[in-house]
């Protein structure tokens, strides 16, 4: 699993749409994200189909339930061949540890990372809606340390928190960043965004990009441009 490739978020309405989309890349091995929209519309078989087509799959369902339920869900997803899974760090250490137990024999090939704070969460929303009276970066840092203590491979975080997380967890703890927008793109419903190159220079280990690729007039060209910007930032 090469997590240094930009991960394409397949926020599409059906398995057919997803497979047609990846088919436009002429056999190129992609890393794609299956989130709630596609998974709930197409069912588990979409993960299997994407794997059979030669792609790595990030199954981003943000598991958050009692430990035994999350353990069972992680087991099911790992058997589908998912390379990367997400759980909510807010579920607690026991729940995160249970997700790893659920991997069984797939623990060598499937990694679990934790959601810290969604990139749509603003500092104001953290305080007024979640009633968390600490700076957003401190909340993210706390969740990252908790996830590492539970044995997870990394976290999902914005580029703005990536360097801070690396400072408390070490460089090998993954920092997977959504909310990526090429220069000049619309921000949409994201609150904390960055360009691919900026995310690399700010310490992200991997990036997730959806609409700037899937909604582009030429998705293949858009993907390659984002990949080039990302790689240039990583080498800088």
Curated annotation (Swiss-Prot):
UniProt catalytic activity: orotidine 5'-phosphate + H(+) = UMP + CO2
Protein's job: Catalyzes the decarboxylation of orotidine 5'-monophosphate (OMP) to uridine 5'-monophosphate (UMP).
Keyword field contains Zinc: no
Pathway participation: Pyrimidine metabolism; UMP biosynthesis via de novo pathway; UMP from orotate: step 2/2
InterPro entries per the UniProt record, alphabetical: Aldolase_TIM, OMPdecase, OMPdecase_AS, OMPdecase_bac, OMPdeCOase_dom, RibuloseP-bd_barrel
A GO term from the CC aspect: cytosol
Keywords of this entry: Decarboxylase, Lyase, Pyrimidine biosynthesis
Family, similarity comment: Belongs to the OMP decarboxylase family. Type 1 subfamily.
Active site: 62
CDD domains: OMP_decarboxylase_like
The protein's name in its UniProt record: Orotidine 5'-phosphate decarboxylase
GO BP, sorted A to Z: 'de novo' pyrimidine nucleobase biosynthetic process; 'de novo' UMP biosynthetic process
Source organism superkingdom: Bacteria
Residue positions binding substrate: 11, 33, 60-69, 119, 181, 190, 210-211
Quaternary data: Homodimer.
EC code: 4.1.1.23
Classification via SMART domains: OMPdecase (SM00934)
GO molecular function list: orotidine-5'-phosphate decarboxylase activity
